[in-house]
Every structure is written in structure tokens, then in C-alpha cells.
Amino acid sequence: AQIGIYDAYAGAFRTIHHNLEAALTATGVNDASGQTNASAAKASAKSRFESTKQRFFNHLLMGMKASTVIRAIEDDVAEGFACVIQVVSTGESLLKHRLEAMDPEDELVEGALTPRDYVLSYLEQAFPIHAQKLVEIDGNMVAEPLRDANGTLVVSREAEALRDEAMMELMSLAPIPSALDQILWAFGDEVVAEVTGRSIRPLKSSDGALFIEKRSASSNSSETRAFMEGEKDILIFSDAGGTGRSYHAAQTAKNQKRRRHYLLEPGWRADAAIQGLGRTHRSA
């Protein structure tokens, strides 16, 4: 099933890539031969696309790992281990973006909390749909945005249709929530200590409904204490939440269970990932 989901998202990105090239021609950024008339506009659109793609697939892979990690944690806890999960991203910016866009009366659902929104934001904000016109500057023909009599940017209907096609394909795909949220929902916040930098988080009530909980400035300290005191058997931390803290079975800690450390998301910095591993591997 996961292979099918991944292939579907890969297909959606292939559509975006193809439509992006077509839109660059439709708007006049590229000419019919593929030569660029507006190198800055093309570079901006393509760099935003590549960074969005990289960010999205990182989140997608993390989310798809979650089910396997959850099963492993269940086994570890049953065997008497205390589990520590290391991540980098928390998805807070995505959550805040979604909440800002929602109507106050709308119900929060899992499908709304997916990194798919990163790509939709790119398509809405950075996909090239504005027509360009050729002008001569210092003997060189370059493209600049075309405006109507009122000074409003002119939209290329062809490029707009290409964007909408890509958005429709993307929105039809199955949502994959973040790994952090999936772990919290699977075990419950009464079992999982969260030590991250986010100020709000989505939790599930006993009936499965999602709600938003605010986290205070002291949340990380109290969550760390709960884990080290043995009140919670699972701890998940991010770069921001892990700074200056230790999660090993220290002689002064009540929680003397052996640790199982899951490097779920190593991130882009090897030194930070290794430093995180050290938080469960201390000598005293």
C-alpha cells in the first residue's frame, strides 16, 4: 500500500514538473525553442519547486516510517524498555498555516495536517501564471511582467489551467500525517513525553476527535521530568527541544529502564544527529 501511495505522489510531482515547464513557455518566460527570456523568474520558480519537493518527500518518508516505528515501540515497551525518538521537524508551521486558513467553525481532521499543504502553497504562491512581455534593454531582449491598463499583472489562462490541473491531482491523493503526530496519537500524550519547540499541537480525544492544545514555555521541562521520573515510557524530542537535556538512565533518575533510541529523522547535519544520540548514552 505504501509503495502505491509513494508512486502516486511521485506521479503528481512528475505532473507538476511537466506543467511547470509548459507554464514557463505559456507565460513567455521561455520562448518556443526553450530559451529563457527571464532567467531570474525561471530560476525563482524552479528553485522554489526543488526545495518544496525535497521538503515534502522528507516529510512523506518520515510519515510512512511511523507505522513500523510504532509497532517496534509497542514491542520495546512491552519488554520493559524506555523509548526515545529523535526527530528534526515538528510540522508546527504547517499546522499554524492550516489553522489560519480554516473557518472557525470547521472541524480539524487528519487530512488537513499533511505536508501536502507545502506543495499546495507553492502552487498557489510561486507557480508561474503571470504573462511576460519582451522588452529591449541595452540592446538585449528580456522579459518582464505584463500589466493591464490598471497596472494589474496579467494572468496566462493556459498557465493557470496547468497549475489547477497539478493541484487537483495532488489533492486527490491520500494524506500522510507527520510521524510526530502519528506517534502521539497512537500512544496518547499521557504515555508520550514531547520535548520539542512547538507551541501548539494536535491531539486526539477519547472519541478520536482532533483538538489543539497549547504548550507553555515550561512544557519541555515538565515532560522531561515525567520521563525521567518514570511517569512516561516514551519520549520524543527535536533539535529545538533537546538542547541541554539528557534522557539516559542517570543514577539520579527514577526511570532506570534501558533506553531504546530511534533516530527517526537524522536531518541534514550529521553532528547534530550524533549529538542527539548522545542524549541517551551517558556514563553517569
Task: For each feature predicted by the language model, list its residue ranges.
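Conserved RecA-like P-loop NTPase helicase motor core
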Residues: 95-101, 107-284
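Conserved helicase/translocase motor-coupling segment
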Residues: 1-99, 162-191
